[in-house]
Amino acid sequence: MSAHKTKRNVSLVTGGDYHDIDYARHRLLGFLLEHAHLRTRVFHTFDNMDGICASECLVTYTCNVVPDPSQVPKLRSFLENGGRWLALHGTNSWLAQNEQGRWYTPGGHEDYFNLLGSRFAAHPPIQPYRVYVTDTCHPVSRDCRDFMVEGGDELYYMHMLADVRVLMQAKASGAARGFVEREWDAGQSHPVLYEKQVGSGCILYFSLGHRRGHWDMEPLLDYYEREEPGAWELPVFSTLMRRSMTWLQEGVK
């Protein structure tokens, strides 16, 4: 008989713009369902922060979905009291376009990004790039080797806002066309996977995971010509996601 496992409640927040949120939600639920004792509630925004923080674990895949500033203290308290948060891809993104059509991050959500530890700024055109493993002692990155993101993903250029434990990183590969912050130092390292302690709790942020289909650029475009699968179909991505789901439930207070 297998050892009894304590039930853990998970809040999954999946919503936002310019990504195939349905696909990400489906895949994330699949990874969570591999652990029968994880019971998941799905949210599309952070509006019900009390409900979200009633769980022991939080998983987010969002873009342009952030908490109201008045709700951030509840999220911080969730972490300080031992909660774990797996934050994926656009979770650190809040975007708008200026009069020239270039993307930038408006103000107003500094407390949220400071808590998360980073803020997305830009990315170069989607293309393959190498991810470098910088910490082989963490349970998520243990024994991993550097790998290529075949097929490409969004290489996030980010502003780091806190001390974090960087597990994997990538090097800037060129200008971020279409963004206000266009020019970045060639070869500058940007975290791809990091861990941040918050009180008794912890955040694991993973920038990989872009996904876009034909109808995911509305209302800017009625139909987006090409599909962008991102890293989701890479075996190494599935491995890291499964390890992240194990990390999510370990050490929960």
Model-flagged regions — what are they?
Residues 2, 9-13, 17-97:
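Helical hinge/lid and interdomain linker segments adjacent to catalytic or ligand-binding clefts
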Residues 2-8, 34, 182-192, 197-253:
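Extracellular ligand-binding/catalytic regions of CAZymes and related secreted enzymes
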Residues 17-18, 48, 65, 92-94, ...:
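Short, solvent-exposed loop/turn segments at secondary-structure junctions
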Residues 23-25, 97-101, 179, 216-219:
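Short aromatic-enriched loop/helix-cap "lid" or pocket-rim segments at secondary-structure transitions
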Residues 24, 71, 136, 237-241:
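Stable alpha-helical elements in mature extracytoplasmic
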Residues 33-37, 41, 53, 118-211:
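Catalytic beta-strand/loop cores that center a nucleophilic Ser/Cys/Thr
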Residues 66-143:
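A glycine-rich, often tryptophan-bearing local segment used as a flexible ligand/cofactor-contacting loop or short
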Residues 82, 144, 248-252:
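A general structural signal marking secondary-structure boundaries and capping sites
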